[in-house]
Amino acid sequence: MTEETPGFEEKPDVPSGATPDDAEPKAADSSEEETAAPAGDLDPTVGLTAQLDQARTALGERTADLQRLQAEYQNYRRRVERDRVTVKEIAVANLLSELLPVLDDVGRARDHGELVGGFKSVAESLETTVAKLGLQQFGKEGEPFDPTIHEALMHSYAPDVTETTCVAILQPGYRIGERTIRPARVAVAEPQPGATPAAAKEEKTDDEESGGTEEV
């Protein structure tokens, strides 16, 4: 029969150098780890998707900015080219305007048969040069009067016209492309008030010769 020694109480095993209170924090730490563990189970693609959406939005904004800048640059280039052409046309038009009196003298000399010899060669060379620069002469007898390109210096009535017509070119007009440098100076004729146009007379004569309308 074993006898228990009085005055001694059994205690749980405690590692050497540790006190019984040290076992309680370990239990608490283990409990915290179990609680924090579910946080690591969140889907990592959620954050990546949000970042991808932000990147796509930023890319769309930058692309729109680039397209706007490209459009502005193209408009700038077209505007510069248009202005360059306009300035060139104005400069050429101003130069050729100074030569119009010389061309008028050449035309009068040709009409009077005085364009001969060396003067003829010089005149033809001048006309060729201004033509290469885009100068065009216009204005012909018999064409309808157009106040945008004709300047009427003489006016009369004629029974053989049906509309205001250029019957004489007093001074030819000149243009460069669509730009009129000088209008053609002309003499015009209008239909005679109360007169029957020649075309109507001829039509009436033809009807009379055919015996009029046949009755059935």
Curated annotation (Swiss-Prot):
InterPro entries: GrpE (IPR000740), GrpE_coiled_coil (IPR013805), GrpE_head (IPR009012)
One GO MF term attached to the UniProt entry: protein homodimerization activity
One CC-aspect GO term: cytoplasm
Main location: cytoplasm
Domain of life of the organism encoding this protein: Bacteria
Gene3D superfamilies: 3.90.20.20, Head domain of nucleotide exchange factor GrpE
Oligomeric form and interacting partners: Homodimer.
Protein name listed in UniProt: Protein GrpE
Organism from which the protein derives: Streptomyces griseus subsp. griseus (strain JCM 4626 / CBS 651.72 / NBRC 13350 / KCC S-0626 / ISP 5235)
Lineage: Bacteria, Bacillati, Actinomycetota, Actinomycetes, Kitasatosporales
